[in-house]
Amino acid sequence: MRVNYHQPLLRRNYALGVVNGVVFIAASAFMEPTAVLPAFVLALTGGGKIWVGIVAALITSGWFWPQIFLAGFFSTRRRLLPFYRISSAGRVSAILGIAAVVAFSPHGPHAWVFMAVAGLFFVYASCGAVGMIPFFSIVSDSMPANRRGRFFGLRCLLGGLLAILAGIAVKAILSEQHGLLFPQNYVLLFTIAAVLMAVSAGAFSIVTEPEHNVQRHKLPMPMEVVRGPRLLRRDRNFRLLMWSRAFGAIAAGSSGPFLVPFALEVLKAPQAVVGAFLVVMAAASAGSNLLWSRIGDTQGNRKLLIWSSATAVLPAAIALVSLAVPPAPLGTWFGLPLTLRLAVFSLAFIPLGFAAPGQDIGQTNFLLDIAPERRRSAYLGFSYLVMLPLAWWPVVGALIIGTARFSLAFALGSLAAAAALLTVTRLDEPRADDLGLAEAPAPEPGLQSVPAGG
C-alpha cells in the first residue's frame, strides 16, 4: 500500500480539528469568495468586473504559490505546528488590515484603496497556503485514511450550519433597513470574520503534533521541479487528478466570481440578496456532507469525486438557462423582491454549495491516498505549480463577460465542468483493496445508482 490506512487515531487532534474547521467555515462565510467578495469589490470599484476577476485570481494564486517553494522546506522539518501558528496570525492580521483600509479610506473608488485591499487579500491567501502543508500533514498523521472523510465531512456539516446563521447576519448587515451603508457594512463583516478566524486558529494551534517521517536532506528547488513532472508521468491517478482540477479551475473561474455580479447588474437584485444566496449555499453544503463523507469513507474518494463533479456541472448551466426566463414578479423571498428569473437563477447556488464540500474532501483525500508519505510534499507542491497559471482564469472570465456578456462565460463554465467530470471517471480507486472493490473500469455516472446517504 502506498499510504498507511491504519494510522492511529489521536482523538484530541480529531476533536480540535473539527472545532477548527467549524469555526473557520463560519468565519469564511462573512467573506465568502463567490457571494460576499464580488459584491464588495463591485461596490469598492464602482462596478468593474475585471477587478472582481483580479481579486479572485489573487486569492487563488495566493493559495498556490507558497506551496511551490515550501514543499522541500517542510519535508525536512519534524515540527510543523509553529509554521501553522505563524501563518494563522498573518491571516487574521490581513483581514483586520482590510477592514481598517476600507474604514478609513475616502469616499468613492480610489486606485490606491483597491490596490491595498487586493494586496491584503493576496497576503491573507498566501499566509493560509503557508499553513496548508503543516495542517494536512498533521491531520494525515493523526488519523487513519478511512476516518478522514468523516473528519472533513463533520467539519463541513457543522460549519455549514453555522454558515447558515452567518448568511442571515450578512443579509441583515447588507440590508438598507439595517442602517449601515458602504463601507461600514463590509467593515463589520470583515471584523467578524477576523475574530472567528482567530478562534479557529487557536483551536488547531493546541493540537498534539504527531511524529512525521521526514527526508534527511532538503532537495534543491530545481530537483523538486524535476521530480514533479516525473511523478505526473509515472502516476496515472495523479495525472488524471490534475487534469480534472485544471478543467474545474476553468469552470470555476468562468462563472463562480460572476454569479453575484450577474444578479446585481442584470437581474437588478438588491445588495442584501448576497445574504440570501449565502444561506442557500450554506444549507446545501451542510446537507451534502452526510452524503459526501459516507461515500468517501465507504466507497472511496474516486466515487466521491465522480458524484461531486457531476453536481458541479449544474451551477453555470442553471445560470445560463435563467437568461431565457422572463422576469415575471413572484412576490418576496427572504424579504426581498423576487422575479421568476431571479428564482431560477437562485437555484444555481444549491448545487454550488452542494458540490463544493465534495470536491474539497474528495480532491484532498484522493491526493493523500495516492501520495506516499515521504513524497507527500512533492505531490502537494507540484500540484500547486500546475494550478498556479489557472488561478488567473477569472481575469479571462471577466474579459469574456466584458465583450460577450455573461452567456459565453457561463457556457464555457458548463463545458469545462463536464470535462472535469469525464476525467474523474477514469481514475482508479487507490483504496480498492481496503474497500473490497473490484479493479474494474468505472461505469458512466448515469449508469450508476445513487449511493445512499448517511
Model-flagged regions — what are they?
Residues L37-L44, G72-T76, A99-G108, L162-Q184, ...:
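Transmembrane alpha-helix termini and helix-breaking/packing motifs in multi-pass membrane transporters
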Residues P66-R79, L174, S288-N301, I401:
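Helix-to-loop junctions at the C-terminal end of transmembrane segments
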Residues A89-H110, A310-P337:
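C-terminal ends and interior cores of transmembrane alpha-helices
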Residues M1-W65, F74, Y84, R91, ...:
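Helix-loop boundary and gating motifs at the non-cytosolic
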Residues G128-M143, L259, P357-A371:
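Intracellular juxtamembrane helix-capping segments at the cytosolic ends
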